[in-house]
């Protein structure tokens, strides 16, 4: 995970001090790209322990088109709690946009189903794009999309994915985002009969919150360990049929977790 650690180091040393929506303060850079060959292991940060349960359940929640935290709460995942209303609702966030994007005529579009069908139909398409940035519904969202747009690319029987993330909380959020979209790439590849290529992560405002500096420095003192391996149940070929038990991460041997506050 050298690309991720390089980003941490660069922002600590060269980032610009900026104010932010949460009032915490950040150090940030604009425009950064990381590339991970998914054949070299599953890109899960090893210099601190990540909560795999949260990463997997959140992605499954997105893919079901859900926008209420009930499913997450039932599975001991708390990462969206701070933004939910009293009924557990978040408004038309990621799951709604991925599965039920509402156009100006009121017609809903299942972007993810279209994507799977189009990869099978026309793998050389340059239009294999999913967007969560539905301008007309942004005001209704509890949190506007940070990972806002992603594109797939097929060559030599391998599927690659590039994510554009407008805003990246480098210490807490970005490791989750890397793992989540790497997992999604594997799942889409299996659902379309392809192998995996690269995951490319492009960040707009890549920032460290001021109350994460010490934790980032601590993480940089640790030596990365071997990447784990992802195993998907080979019998699942429908992207929307994956369940938690169909996904296994083997050989994950991280350093201990490093706690840090979430900026809300």
Swiss-Prot record:
Pathway: Pyrimidine metabolism; dTTP biosynthesis. PROSITE patterns: THYMIDYLATE_SYNTHASE. Transmembrane segments: none annotated. Gene3D superfamilies: Thymidylate synthase/dCMP hydroxymethylase domain. It is an enzyme of class 2 (transferase). Keywords: Cytoplasm, Methyltransferase, Nucleotide biosynthesis, Transferase. HAMAP family: Thymidy_synth_bact. This is Thymidylate synthase.
């Amino acid at each position: 995970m050298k690309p991720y650690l390089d980003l941490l180091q660069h922002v600590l040393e060269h980032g610009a001090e900026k104010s932010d929506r949460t009032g915490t303060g950040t150090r940030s850079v604009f425009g950064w790209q990381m590339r991970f060959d998914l054949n070299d292991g599953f890109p899960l940060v090893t210099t601190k322990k990540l909560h795999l349960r949260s990463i997997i359940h959140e992605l499954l929640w997105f893919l079901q088109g859900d926008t209420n935290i009930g499913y997450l709460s039932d599975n001991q995942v708390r990462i969206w709690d701070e933004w939910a209303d009293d009924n557990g609702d978040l408004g038309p966030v990621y799951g709604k946009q991925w599965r039920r994007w509402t156009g100006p005529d009121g017609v809903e579009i299942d972007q993810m189903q279209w994507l799977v069908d189009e990869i099978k139909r026309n793998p050389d398409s340059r239009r294999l794009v999913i967007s969560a940035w539905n301008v007309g519904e942004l005001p209704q969202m509890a949190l506007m999309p940070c990972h806002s747009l992603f594109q797939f690319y097929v060559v030599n029987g391998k599927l690659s994915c590039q994510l554009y993330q407008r805003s990246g909380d480098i210490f807490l959020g970005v490791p989750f985002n890397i793992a989540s979209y790497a997992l999604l790439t594997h799942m889409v590849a299996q659902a379309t009969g392809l192998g995996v290529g690269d995951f490319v992560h492009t960040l707009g405002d890549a920032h460290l919150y001021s109350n994460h500096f010490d934790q980032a420095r601590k993480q940089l003192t640790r030596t990365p360990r071997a990447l784990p391996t992802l195993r998907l149940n080979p019998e699942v070929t429908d992207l929307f049929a994956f369940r938690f038990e169909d996904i296994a991460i083997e050989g994950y041997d991280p350093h201990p977790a490093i706690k840090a506050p979430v900026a809300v």
